[in-house]
C-alpha cells in the first residue's frame, strides 16, 4: 500500500553555508527520487528569500518509506539539522462518482 508523504527541509538558522545547503538539498532530493513511486511536487524558496526552504510531496510504498525514513534521519544528523519535517497520510480523490 502506498501513501502520500511530504518532506520539508530548511536552513532558517543559517547553520549551512550556501555550498552545504546545496549538498543537503541534493542528497535529500536524490533520496526521495530513488524511493518514491511518484513525485507530485518539489520546490524551494525564492532565490532572494531571506530563508532557504524546500518541500517535496510524493507517493511512496511502505517498505520504501521505511528505508527513506532511515536515510532522512541520517541526512539530518550528517548536515547538523535540528529537524526535518515528515508528514504522511492517505490521499482521497474527490471525483464525480
Language model feature labels by segment:
Residues 37, 77-96:
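Conserved short beta-strand edge segments in small beta-sheet-based binding/regulatory domains
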Residues 15-19, 62-70:
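Short, conserved charged micro-motifs
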Residues 8, 17, 54-57, 83-85, ...:
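Extended, folded cores of ATP/NTP-driven motor/assembly subunits in large transport
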Residues 1-24:
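Short S/T/G/P-rich N-terminal loop/turn motif that feeds into the first structured element of a domain
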Residues 24-27, 66-79:
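Short amphipathic alpha-helices in soluble, non-transmembrane regions
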Residues 22, 41, 95-97:
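Secreted/extracellular ectodomain signature
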Residues 18-38:
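Short, flexible N-terminal segments of the mature chain
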Residues 33-66:
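Short, intrinsically disordered low-complexity segments
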